[in-house]
């Protein structure tokens, strides 16, 4: 069986204040592209693994830059979808002295968040893969994405893939009327490998 690993998630534009400044003090931002599942893909590629990243990007210069960034790390991008108009963005103040880090998300109505079941050809993607990796962030964003996660997990399980799951609980992302417990507990039962702290596990299992 192929050793290819498939990761699924949202790659985002990160705008970081320079020199430990607050957002209110900044006139410039440092630009990076990344995300939890993209970082997993980069780590796999850095260790010499074969990895394919699945996401949806806007068909513009920002989306093209994300593709270039992923390819620079030898990550497969041939199954990435294009559509929608927005790249998820977040603004970051790094921790400094007695101050905690601060993150402001702007990802509502992003290209990724508009994904629905049936839009991704999982059978084609999984036919030469052995592991599927997803995270709780994916299911936290919208009900449609929670259904996409279930769709991917069900097909991966049917096709004999090992399923890797990062709990990655983010309280502030669960805003569509369902709790993490309601959504994630059924999805977790099909996972073979799980990452997370004891606290995260307790939160999503009750």
Language-model features and meaning:
Residues 1-76:
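Glycine-rich phosphate/adenosyl-contacting loop at the front of the ribokinase-like
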Residues 7-8, 79, 105, 164-165, ...:
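General beta-strand structural signal in soluble alpha/beta enzymes
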Residues 11, 84, 109, 169-171, ...:
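Glycine-rich beta-alpha junction loops
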Residues 20-23, 67-69, 119-120, 146-149, ...:
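Short, glycine/charged-enriched secondary-structure capping and boundary segments
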Residues 32-39, 117, 176-179:
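Short secondary-structure boundary/capping elements
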Residues 50-136:
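Conserved N-terminal subdomain of the carbohydrate kinase-like
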Residues 131, 137-206:
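Conserved beta-alpha-beta core of the PfkB/ribokinase-like small-molecule kinase fold
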